[in-house]
Design a protein with these regions (language model features):
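Select transmembrane alpha-helical segments in multipass membrane proteins
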Residues: 6, 61-73, 121-131, 154-173, ...
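Small-residue-rich segments of transmembrane alpha-helices in multi-pass membrane proteins
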Residues: 30-42, 63-67, 205-211, 237-238
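Membrane-water interface regions at transmembrane-helix termini and the short interhelical loops
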Residues: 8-29, 41, 215-226
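Membrane-interface interhelical connector segments
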Residues: 138-161, 187, 191-195
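Loop-to-transmembrane helix boundary motifs in multi-pass membrane proteins
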Residues: 2-4, 159-161, 173, 189-221
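Extracellular/periplasmic helix-exit of transmembrane alpha-helices
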Residues: 89-93, 98, 118-147
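Helix-loop junctions at the membrane interface of multi-pass solute transporters
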Residues: 73-109, 133-134, 185-190
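Hydrophobic alpha-helical segments and their helix-loop junctions in multi-pass secondary transporters
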Residues: 32-58, 69-89
């Protein structure tokens, strides 16, 4: 719980004291750390790439796995980020540009959206591959995130467990930042305004979304299951 409180405070301060460009660079840095962390982890395990490719092309749906499947979909696509990308597009004030400039920027935003989804898919795939090559192969059932870190130590060593925890922390911070910005954008849009962190409506949207999410944590008995359900809700939003 204290970790959630500190993360929320850190994100609110970061959003309220930095420009969009600085926040964008910070998110790129966070995601880079996540990607490099899981690349490092994958080098420590033996992956059956033929089975992995088969799973990507012809996935199976075991009984009782629908919750996990939907949560992975929500974690990869993250519909609130689509709202955020829409806000970015509108903020360019296309009415002051010609059609060629508009098409160019729209193509860039399309590429940016697809690229972010591909990166999200790659990171989630890396997590699944890591779990398959360690926990599933060893017949270990993981029921909470802290257990996952602890179980990685005897399997891959202390450094792998620390890197895994660091990657999860960076993932939590980056997703909290984007969800807060998306909420601020949506709330400001209700009043016909664009997202700007100095605007009171944008600030209220950020505080409401992160504050409510933080309060819900106090009522969730099983954080691991709560995480799965929250990501499943994201997939339903699609």
């Amino acid at each position: 719980i204290w970790g959630s409180i500190l993360t929320t405070v850190f994100v609110v301060v970061m959003l309220f004291t930095n420009s969009y460009k600085k926040i964008e660079r910070s998110i790129i840095a966070f995601v880079s750390v996540i990607g490099l962390s899981f690349i490092y982890e994958l080098f420590l395990v033996k992956i059956d790439w033929s089975l992995a490719a088969q799973g990507w092309v012809t996935p199976s749906f075991p009984h009782g796995s629908m919750l996990i499947i939907m949560s992975v979909l929500g974690a990869v696509v993250m519909p609130h980020n689509l709202f955020l990308h829409s806000e970015v597009i509108q903020s360019h004030e296309y009415n002051k540009k010609d059609d060629a400039s508009i098409r160019k920027v729209l193509k860039y935003e399309l590429f940016d959206t697809l690229f972010s989804m591909i990166v999200g898919w790659a990171i989630n795939s890396a997590m699944i591959l890591l779990a398959a090559a360690t926990f599933f192969k060893s017949g270990i059932q993981v029921e909470e995130l802290q257990q996952a870190k602890s179980l990685l130590e005897p399997l891959l060593g202390n450094s792998a467990a620390v890197v895994f925890a660091l990657a999860l922390l960076m993932a939590g911070i980056s997703s909290t930042i984007t969800s807060g910005m998306a909420a601020g954008s949506i709330f400001a849009g209700i009043f016909g305004e664009s997202y700007h962190i100095k605007d009171s409506h944008s600030q209220v949207g950020v505080i409401l979304s992160l504050g409510i999410a933080l309060l819900l944590i106090f009522f969730i008995g099983d954080p691991f299951k709560g995480l799965l359900i929250s990501q499943m809700i994201l997939s339903i939003q699609l």
